[in-house]
Amino acid sequence: MDEAETDATENKRASEAKRASAMPPPPPPPPPISPPALIPAPAAGEEGPASLGQAGAAGCSRSRPPALEPERSLGRLRGRFEDYDEELEEEEEMEEEEEEEEEMSHFSLRLESGRADSEDEEERLINLVELTPYILCSICKGYLIDATTITECLHTFCKSCIVRHFYYSNRCPKCNIVVHQTQPLYNIRLDRQLQDIVYKLVINLEEREKKQMHDFYKERGLEVPKPAAPQPVPSSKGKTKKVLESVFRIPPELDMSLLLEFIGANEDTGHFKPLEKKFVRVSGEATIGHVEKFLRRKMGLDPACQVDIICGDHLLERYQTLREIRRAIGDTAMQDGLLVLHYGLVVSPLKIT
């Protein structure tokens, strides 16, 4: 029994050894994978390494796909991020352009609406009554003719109205400011722009005024004055051409020329400034009171000082006008076309304390 059992055991071992020898040997274990060397990314214009498709895919050749180099993967990721950033920038630029176009469209709409509003305002009719206070003369209560403005207060009147007013007063008819102590006509100027506005606002006003002026001169047998035309500028080469008259012309209202001669002062008058210019041109409607005020202001006289003005042998009163004095005294008061007035300074006995 023991021998039979040992034979069976040996036979079994022999059959197992045959089976084992008939089976193919197991494949060797794969070698350990070492980290690949860092390969720099290809420069622009150079050909890079073969792609995965060229080396063979794992599904067709059972070969293990090569590991991706870190540098190449980083370069591709950077390229992808750069492309994505460029796309984002392009999208942002497109959005900004669209927003600008929308703003410009809104702005153009506002401009068009503003233009429409301005055109409506320009076409809006204004009642002439609203502008009447600005184009009327406060003296004659009519429309301004030959609009003349006072330079001290900028109030405007008809030329004839304000000149006639200054015959009796040296103050503005509106604000009562002193225009000039002795010669208010020096501080008025023609306002041609305002006169043009008046003529454009009031229909046929200019034509009616010209017709009335023409009829006025024609009824009295006088020559109708022609409008002033600009004179040609003389050539510097032509010696035979006449020299044009001076641009400065004395207003016809200032028709009286004075010669103021100082005859002396008593000892109690104190200090005073001498009169620098003794030749004065004024209106014939100016009074001796105006001349006295002129002398006081120019010479800086004390209020206690009295000014006596004499023409010939006559002591003149403050209310007398220069035209009346010339008419009353005659040519004896004249010297080379000048009205000679002598003045002296004394201290008033009523003001001595």
UniProtKB/Swiss-Prot annotation:
GO terms for biological process: chromatin remodeling; negative regulation of transcription by RNA polymerase II. It is found in: Nucleus. Residues 83-103 have a biased composition (Acidic residues). Disulfide bonds: none annotated. The modification Phosphoserine is found at residues 34, 118. Residues 9-19, 69-82 have a biased composition (Basic and acidic residues). Keywords: Coiled coil, Isopeptide bond, Metal-binding, Nucleus, Phosphoprotein, Repressor, Transcription, Transcription regulation, Ubl conjugation, Zinc, Zinc-finger. Its main location: nucleus. The keyword Nucleus applies. Transmembrane segments: none annotated. A zinc finger (RING-type) spans 137-176. Expressed in ovary, testis, stomach, liver, thymus and kidney (at protein level). Transcriptional repressor. May modulate the levels of histone H3K4Me3 by activating KDM5D histone demethylase. Component of a Polycomb group (PcG) multiprotein PRC1-like complex, a complex class required to maintain the transcriptionally repressive state of many genes, including Hox genes, throughout development. PcG PRC1 complex acts via chromatin remodeling and modification of histones; it mediates monoubiquitination of histone H2A 'Lys-119', rendering chromatin heritably changed in its expressibility. Within the PRC1-like complex, regulates RNF2 ubiquitin ligase activity. Component of a PRC1-like complex. Interacts with BMI1/PCGF4, RING1 and RNF2. Interacts with KDM5D. Interacts with CBX4, CBX6, CBX7 and CBX8. This is Polycomb group RING finger protein 6. It comes from Mus musculus.
